[in-house]
Amino acid sequence: MSKTHLTEQKFSDFALHPKVVEALEKKGFHNCTPIQALALPLTLAGRDVAGQAQTGTGKTMAFLTSTFHYLLSHPAIADRKVNQPRALIMAPTRELAVQIHADAEPLAQATGLKLGLAYGGDGYDKQLKVLESGVDILIGTTGRLIDYAKQNHINLGAIQVVVLDEADRMYDLGFIKDIRWLFRRMPPANQRLNMLFSATLSYRVRELAFEQMNNAEYIEVEPEQKTGHRIKEELFYPSNEEKMRLLQTLIEEEWPDRAIIFANTKHRCEEIWGHLAADGHRVGLLTGDVAQKKRLRILDEFTRGDLDILVATDVAARGLHIPAVTHVFNYDLPDDCEDYVHRIGRTGRAGASGHSISLACEEYALNLPAIETYIGHSIPVSKYNPDALMTDLPKPLRLTRPRTGNGPRRTGAPRNRRRSG
């Protein structure tokens, strides 16, 4: 298979419903990515699919295309009631559910199928109002879905298509019991089309597929290496005292168009935000305790380009699909090897190149050997001159103003480059 982002296979080559093809082409989707080219022949034949592919490989459009085609090509279950959706798409996080819904909207507009969205945090009555009018495809997180189901606001007895996205993260976040609860209220596996997608097809994910799917076909799209060949990786060994100044110096050197900085704790993220906001960067903060409306606003501002930098924890950033991220900074090396892959996979997406910079400090350097074993290669090491690090830095801000940061728009050139040769 070609290692380029797109294959020679076109959506129009498949026997897809004409309205689906029209909607795809209107949005500029003509050629399939590898995961789409593997999945569509199976789902169009009514086969269940368990797919492994990294983030940014087009798996969302693979299962949305399959879902819309299936519902348009098969009649609804007889005597279906208004509170019975025909398809259910489960996601591990609110943000991912919202983004899947946004990706599905052009297809819904073109086909007339109705979408519903269900996630926790806020919007309970607003989401419920949409559900009460009847939806064909319901996208949501498991907790809110169970809440609606227990109150009979939704009934899963007419489900014809099920999608489980980022199944490995469902396990990591402890949602597997919720998933099984929802599956038990659906028609049997052989009476519906089932799709599962995951960054890793581990034993536990395969076990779930065996339990809840109908003889699923396993498909995998493996890059040359786990971290993707379009991502330039770089590693520094700072002392704890120099770590923050090194980060700020690297940001001045790289001057990223759009960057995500990962840290292992909420407190550390807030500290980074305070330093960067004080230095005039347009920076947003995304941690688990940020209110849902604010989270969505921050993501929207970052996606639009109103913010240049996003500081986030792993939990807060899981499942996010943000285009054109040029740089990822691992301020802390993650404790989980898979989190390293997920983090740097935020850049180098959709055929673009990206740059990942990791800081192996005294506290987290012990995580490095396991990460390098997992990704199958050593991360190239770069050196820096401690005497050249930035020193003229303002006092960091504290979280007494909106976390989205209101630093002035960056203008002009960055400060002088300070990395040693």
Swiss-Prot record:
Residues the record lists as binding ATP: 53-60
Domain of life, per lineage: Bacteria
Main location: cytoplasm
GO CC terms, sorted: cytosol
Renumbered residue ranges of the record's region Disordered: 392-421
Enzyme class of the recorded protein, top EC level: hydrolase
Biased composition (Low complexity): 402-414
Motif Q motif per record, residues: 9-37
Reactions the enzyme catalyzes: ATP + H2O = ADP + phosphate + H(+)
InterPro entries tied to this protein: DEAD/DEAH_box_helicase_dom, DEAD_box_RNA_helicase, Helicase_ATP-bd, Helicase_C-like, P-loop_NTPase, RNA-helicase_DEAD-box_CS, RNA_helicase_ATP-dep_RhlB, RNA_helicase_DEAD_Q_motif
Gene Ontology molecular functions: ATP binding; ATP hydrolysis activity; RNA binding; RNA helicase activity
Keyword Transmembrane helix: no
Database matches in Pfam families: DEAD, Helicase_C
Similarity annotation: Belongs to the DEAD box helicase family. RhlB subfamily.
Name under which the protein is recorded: ATP-dependent RNA helicase RhlB
Organism: Escherichia fergusonii (strain ATCC 35469 / DSM 13698 / CCUG 18766 / IAM 14443 / JCM 21226 / LMG 7866 / NBRC 102419 / NCTC 12128 / CDC 0568-73)
Lineage, highest ranks first: Bacteria, Pseudomonadati, Pseudomonadota, Gammaproteobacteria, Enterobacterales
